[in-house]
Amino acid sequence: YEFKVSGDDINTTLIDLSSNDYFGLSRDKDVINAAHETTLIEGLGSGSSRFISGSRPIHKSLETNLGKWLNQDSVLLFPSGYQANIAAIQALTDKNSIIIADRLIHNSLLVGSKTSGAKLIRFLHNNLKDLEKKLSKYSIINNSILVVIESIYSMEGSIAPIEKITKLCKKHNCKLLVDEAHALGILGNQGKGLSHPFLDSI
């Protein structure tokens, strides 16, 4: 997004290519006003985790609306994408599982994989041949395999061949986790992310 910079020696408009604020919503007047109005009603924080007493009607409302938008039975909000990734991997694996992950996955996915107790195997970035080689090797000895990828890799912008990866996972009877952090709301039909057309296979 564009933003103005001014000072003693500079007065110009720049384009931000280094942040995750793709649409400049952090400085959008309508968003700021809506946040202000909501703060007057909800306050500045819930006071505790949702597990204790921090679950507010606004959380439930957002989860319900996101679920309808994404055609999902339910959606669960987390304080951050980092925490969501760690929790998702730990929910889908255990010490007897094998995780086969792209070499360029985000650190949160890597931390989740390592703390899950599962065996972690890496495959070459977006390399279907290397992925299938590892799936063929490990699916013979383990029936609890989770493949971990990102739909779009934040560090260098490459897009995963999701359709082909879903077919490989189906062929080898494996689960697939797709991190949509940098695609949801931006890419795909109606901004629903790049994996949305293949949800029945994920």
Region roles according to the model:
Residues Y1-L44, C174:
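N-terminal "arm"/small-domain region of PLP-dependent enzymes with the aminotransferase-like
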Residues H172-N173, K192-I202:
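Conserved active-site segment immediately N-terminal to the catalytic lysine
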Residues A88-N107, L128:
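Conserved PLP-anchoring active-site segment centered on the Schiff-base-forming lysine
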Residues N33, E37-S80:
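Conserved N-terminal alpha-helix of the aminotransferase class I/II PLP-enzyme fold
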Residues K95, T115-G117, H172:
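Short, structured coil segments at secondary-structure junctions
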Residues I121, H125-V178:
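Active-site phosphate-binding strand-loop segment of PLP-dependent enzymes
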Residues S80, I100-G117:
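Substrate-binding/gating loop at the entrance of the active-site cleft, primarily
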